[in-house]
């Protein structure tokens, strides 16, 4: 990311977060209740608030319960929460204000495949895109990735996601689907959490597409 764009994004987020000098709390949404979820994103928000102390002290507060991405968007639009983070798409940028600071840089669009070990023989180094497109994959039912993958000829099922994607890993473990494309940054952490399941990391293929994760705020309540 070029430095001028980075600085501009940081300044915009500073302005939005500090716009209401009387604000005492900033409510962020979350997908999981686990304390480990969103550590990086919350740390970024803390750093930004620490850099704008001249606007007053603001406390970060999690939304009372974990909710799906579609419900997170709704909570911002209703004024029940102030900020969320998510992979972007056109619909989200039309409804909310995106802060175009790529939180994971380009790596949000680098996906490796979590598979059942029984799939290793068919997913060899020589397997081509036709082989990959013959697989049934799984993603969160409200993730923008579904649209990207299906538009490019992949077969994808949507699943209501649960704590640390347990339902997706269980589907792979039970051979209900063939693969779960996962972010390269997060996959090893998640595999460690699901080491009790019969899953492994496919070694030879990488799905790569433009995919950026941003903070979002409501256009009606940009604080």
Regions found by a protein language model. Give the residues of each.
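Ligand-binding "clamshell"
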Residues: 24, 91-103, 190-205, 209-218
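Bilobed "Venus flytrap"/periplasmic-binding protein-like clamshell domains
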Residues: 34-48, 113-156
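Short helices/loops that flank or line small-molecule/ion binding pockets
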Residues: 65-81, 152, 166-186
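A bilobed periplasmic-binding-protein/Venus flytrap-type ligand-binding module shared by bacterial periplasmic
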Residues: 111-127, 210-223
């Amino acid at each position: 990311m070029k430095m001028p764009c980075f600085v501009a994004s940081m300044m915009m987020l500073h302005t939005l977060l500090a716009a209401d000098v009387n604000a005492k709390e900033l409510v962020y949404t979350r997908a999981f209740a686990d304390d480990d979820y969103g550590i990086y994103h919350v740390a970024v928000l803390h750093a930004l608030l620490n850099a704008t102390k001249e606007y007053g002290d603001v406390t970060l507060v999690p939304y009372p319960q974990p909710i799906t991405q579609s419900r997170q968007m709704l909570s911002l639009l209703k004024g029940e929460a102030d900020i969320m983070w998510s992979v972007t798409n056109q619909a989200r940028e039309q409804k909310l204000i995106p802060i175009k600071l790529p939180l994971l840089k380009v790596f949000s669009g680098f996906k490796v495949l979590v598979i059942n070990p029984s799939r290793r023989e068919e997913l060899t180094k020589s397997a081509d895109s036709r082989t990959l497109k013959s697989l049934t994959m799984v993603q969160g039912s409200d993730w923008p990735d579904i649209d990207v993958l299906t538009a490019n000829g992949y077969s994808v099922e949507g699943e209501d996601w649960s704590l640390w994607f347990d339902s997706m890993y269980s589907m792979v473990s039970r051979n209900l689907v063939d693969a779960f494309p996962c972010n390269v940054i997060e996959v090893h952490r998640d595999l460690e959490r699901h080491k009790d399941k019969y899953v492994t990391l496919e070694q030879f293929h990488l799905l790569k597409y433009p995919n950026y994760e941003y903070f979002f705020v409501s256009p009606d309540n940009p604080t």
